[in-house]
Amino acid sequence: MGQIKSVLFDLGNVLAVIDFYKFWSSLGFLRPEEIAPFTDGYISWTRQFESGFVSTNEYLTGLHSVFGRSFSVEQLERAFASIIREPIDGMMEVVKRVSREHRTALVSNTNEIHYKISLDKLDVLGVLPTHYLSYKMRVMKPAQGFYNAIIDDQKIDPSEMLFIDDIPENVNAAKSAGMQAICFEGVEKLNTSLKGFLGSL
């Protein structure tokens, strides 16, 4: 097991609260049966958007069609942007502390709309010098290509990287790529885990 040189932080529900339901409620959909007819189209377009296969304009136009043109493109963009909520308390301090002695980076399945909103709302992103973004890399976690691209760019052994994510599937994929990894379950548990990997901070 290599000594940790680089710590990689996920964005959603690690650095910031993400509320996927906010998209639907912002458009007035409050019950599962109201949402269900549009779910497949929404998920399909969003995966293409976060994989970098469609532009922001193409994505919003696609959603416009999914919803039968019931909402304006502007309404859809505002609703989609509203998914990004507040910073998670305590994570700025964690990132700053880790950054004193380790390389740090953002690793996120995201898109142009959410990334721009996050830059405006989340000061912690300014502390992370490198941002690995699925829509720019054209590959999403948990595909091995996502992790391999990071390993190639970091130019260190994957065992010297510590990957932090709230989704077990993404954490397991990082381990399969040779990285060390933590499944995020809150700041207190993360601090305990970090001491085990990094020693005193």
Task: Name these PLM-found stretches.
Residues 10-13, 52, 98, 106, ...:
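Generic structural signal for small/hydrophobic residues in well-ordered secondary structure
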Residues 158-194:
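Acidic, Mg2+-coordinating phosphoryl-transfer loop and its flanking beta/alpha structural elements
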